Curated annotation (Swiss-Prot):
Job of this protein: Binds directly to 23S rRNA. The L1 stalk is quite mobile in the ribosome, and is involved in E site tRNA release. Protein L1 is also a translational repressor protein, it controls the translation of the L11 operon by binding to its mRNA.
A family per Pfam: Ribosomal_L1
Taxonomic placement: Bacteria, Pseudomonadati, Pseudomonadota, Gammaproteobacteria, Cellvibrionales
Organism: Teredinibacter turnerae (strain ATCC 39867 / T7901)
CDD domains, per the entry: Ribosomal_L1
GO molecular function, one term: tRNA binding
Membrane-spanning residues: none
InterPro entries xrefs: Ribosom_uL1_bac-type, Ribosomal_uL1, Ribosomal_uL1-like, Ribosomal_uL1/biogenesis, Ribosomal_uL1_3-a/b-sand, Ribosomal_uL1_CS
UniProt-listed Gene3D superfamilies: 3.30.190.20, 3.40.50.790
Range of residues in the leader sequence: none
Protein name: Large ribosomal subunit protein uL1
Keywords, alphabetical: Repressor, Ribonucleoprotein, Ribosomal protein, RNA-binding, rRNA-binding, Translation regulation, tRNA-binding
Length: 231
């Protein structure tokens, strides 16, 4: 039997995996158990009462985290003309059309978000097999296909995150760093959950928010008592 590490022992001693933690207690515990030397991300996993196999129960969208993600977001934008200048001014790292598409086809993937104006989707469409599997394909529902590319760049830089239910009906997303103040993590989670509630499909029946869990990159998952959130 493998020996438990010091951190694993601490987790086993301090975490009750059968308990639903109040948000304040959960974040404090995640902070206490974060002993690695890099700034861990706080990840949310939200189990939804949907049938993801049915197209009328798909859940996807975007939310702006009030305190950002703690991550420097690099943005690629497909547009041209005055909109290209505006995108660059807003902080986009990569702006172009066919030239940018050729870079991506050549293996350049040094970005976290892809934004396109509607007219540019004829170019972006050819990149579906590259961007799609990585969750980077622009989509009107997440605000990444828009005439206002500069505004979308600003939103992405300010901490807007996209969400999409996976095959198990679970939303996964980073909501900040463990070094954030407790209240910042709480308010970021509340913003995500609030927008998830707005995105509830009309066809979804029964309990929609079935379970909310928080974890850090290297830490345990803690179930959150939903009554401790202002949602």
């Amino acid at each position: 039997m493998a020996k438990l590490t010091k951190r694993q022992k601490a987790i086993n001693e301090k975490v009750d995996f059968n308990k639903a933690y109040g948000i304040d207690e959960a974040v404090a515990l995640l902070k206490e158990l974060s002993t690695v030397k890099f700034p861990e991300t706080v990840d949310a996993a939200i189990n939804l009462g949907i049938d993801p196999r049915k197209s009328d129960q798909a859940v996807r969208g975007a939310t702006s985290l009030p305190h950002g993600t703690g991550k420097d977001v690099r943005v690629a934008v497909f547009t041209q003309g005055a909109a290209a200048d505006a995108a660059k001014e807003a902080g986009a790292e990569f702006v172009g059309m066919e030239d940018l598409a050729d870079q991506i086809k050549g293996g350049m993937m040094d970005f976290d978000v892809v934004i396109a104006d509607p007219a540019a989707m004829r170019v972006v469409g050819a990149l579906g097999q590259i961007l799609g599997p990585r969750g980077l394909m622009p989509n009107p529902k997440t605000g990444t296909v828009t005439p206002d590319v500069a505004g979308a760049v600003k939103n992405a830089k300010a901490g807007q995150v996209r969400f999409r239910a996976d095959k198990g009906g679970v939303i996964h997303g980073g909501i900040g760093k463990v070094s954030f103040e407790l209240n910042a993590i709480k308010e970021n989670l509340e913003a995500l959950v609030s927008d998830l509630k707005k995105a509830k499909p009309a066809a979804a029946k029964g309990v929609y928010l079935k379970k909310i869990s928080l974890s850090t990159t290297m830490g345990p998952g803690l179930t959150i008592d939903q009554s401790s959130l202002e949602i």
